[in-house]
Every structure is written in C-alpha cells, then in structure tokens.
Amino acid sequence: MWLPTPLGPLWLEVSPLGVRRLEPALYPRGPEAEGALALRVREAVQAYFAGERPDFLDLPLDYTGLSPARLRLYERVRLVPYGRTVSYGALGRELGLSPRAVGAALRACPFFLLVPAHRVIHADGRLGGFQGQEGLKLWLLRFEGAL
C-alpha cells in the first residue's frame, strides 16, 4: 500500500504477525498491504504528519528473520519519545552493543517512523546517517521540535 506523505510516498507491507515494512520507496517492494492493520498504519502515519504525535506502539511489527539483538534495539528505540533524541552510544551501552552496531542496525531498519531511528544521533549532536538520507532525518527532527 502506498502512503502519501509530505516527504514522498511510503511503501507498506503487512503480514499476519504485523507490519513487515514501512519505508520510503519509489516502487513497490512486495505484496500490496490490505486489511485492518494496513488501515491503522495509514491512519497513524496521517496523524503523525498532522502533528498529532502518535507513538505507534499499538502497531505490531513483524520481526521475522531479525536477530534477538536487533529486535531488542528496535523495541528500545520505539520508546524514544516524540521530540526527544538519544545517542548511538547510550543505546549501545544500555543494550551491550557498539555504537557502530546500533547505527548499522538502524540503517537497515525496515520500519520507518514506527521505529523512530531518526531520533538516534551522535552524542556530540551530529545527526549521523539515516538510510542514506541525512536531510530526511533533519526534516523529521525539526518537524518534531527536537532541533
């Protein structure tokens, strides 16, 4: 399912377990999302861009194929509040991972907005990469009032 946003289209895929993928895309990456969960995700994304600050925690994610470490990281990042940031190093210390491992896992995260990887920055305030699109990360952090 395509979700239009101010940043461009997002592609959504769902499985019986939850959201399988939500990410910026120029072309479909898999089967079309349908059903109640797809509609809930669409409504939550629309609410986010309307400034309503949903936390997305009520949306189940399908972590099939992910390592236990990556699952723990994604679940922890889901708890970073709207308008706040946390550092790669702080997450790494908390979860027993290196900051580079945190960054690599977040770059590969298929759950755009639902796992708010854009809220993870360097301890010195530099943004760091974000799916290869630092400008997108900057836009989201400004939109949320974190910068």
From Swiss-Prot:
- Family annotation (InterPro entries): MethylDNA_cys_MeTrfase_DNA-bd, MethylDNA_cys_MeTrfase_DNAb, MGMT_N_sf, WH-like_DNA-bd_sf
Q: Which domain of life is it from?
A: Bacteria
UniProt-listed GO biological process terms: DNA repair
Sorted keywords for this record are: DNA damage, DNA-binding
Molecular-function GO terms, alphabetical: DNA binding; methylated-DNA-[protein]-cysteine S-methyltransferase activity
Q: Which CDD domains match?
A: ATase (cd06445)
Positions marked as site (Arg finger, required for nucleotide flipping):
R100
Could you confirm whether the keyword Nucleus appears in this record? no
What is known about what this protein does? Involved in DNA damage recognition. Binds DNA containing O(6)-methylguanine and larger O(6)-alkylguanine adducts. Binds to the damaged base and flips the base out of the DNA duplex into an extrahelical conformation, which allows processing by repair proteins. Also affects the regulation of gene expression in response to alkylation.
The subunit field of the Swiss-Prot or TrEMBL record says: Interacts with several proteins, including UvrA, UvrD and the three subunits of the RNA polymerase.
- Which family does this protein fall into? Belongs to the MGMT family. ATL subfamily.
Protein name from the UniProt record = DNA base-flipping protein
Species assigned in the record: Thermus thermophilus (strain ATCC 27634 / DSM 579 / HB8)
